[in-house]
Amino acid sequence: MIVFKVFAAYMGVIATSAVAHPAPNNHQDAGLVSDILTKFHQNDYKLKFERVELVRFNKQYLKKLEVVTYKYNRTSPVVNVTWMYGTDLPDYDAVVQAYRFTSNEYRLFPLRFQMSVCGAIKTSAAGLQTLTHCGNFTGCPFLKDVPTRACNWSPDETRFPPFIPDGEYMLEIQMIFRNAELYVLRAYSSIYRPIVKK
């Protein structure tokens, strides 16, 4: 009987706290994640960026989307992106899932988060602010029927989370507006630690 009373009291506390704190808005949570990502600063490892590829895009929202990776010089690959939206988008979310290359395939790695794209660009998460340095992209919002280009972008390794293990990684980045998938990208890179630290 005592166990039942304790259980009933515990469930009452949970029900009361659920009513007092309604379910958070996913877009607000995405903004919180991009705020957390701005706190990342590391010099523990080096990031060898390889490429970004476009998997698919939704032609109801995008009239054009091209992603091209090329060598800026002998050692630095960079990405050029060209797009034209078919509708005005004030902001949308990115769902990022990491995969690590083991046993001759990319396997699920326990790193997954969702963030606001405009918030990530504004706070320069992973160096995204440099998208506005080359081309005619000036930031959010994303406007309808405006051909936009961002060029010579590469990730900033100092703005990544610390203590990620060495290895080859793939990030699958799914862009979502409300309940619709806009496009999916895959980014490939390697993480390594230098033998000699400076």
Q: In which residue ranges do the predicted regions lie?
A:
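Generic short beta-strand segments
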Residues: 154-156
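N-terminal onset of structured domains
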Residues: 2-131, 135-136, 141-142, 146-150, ...
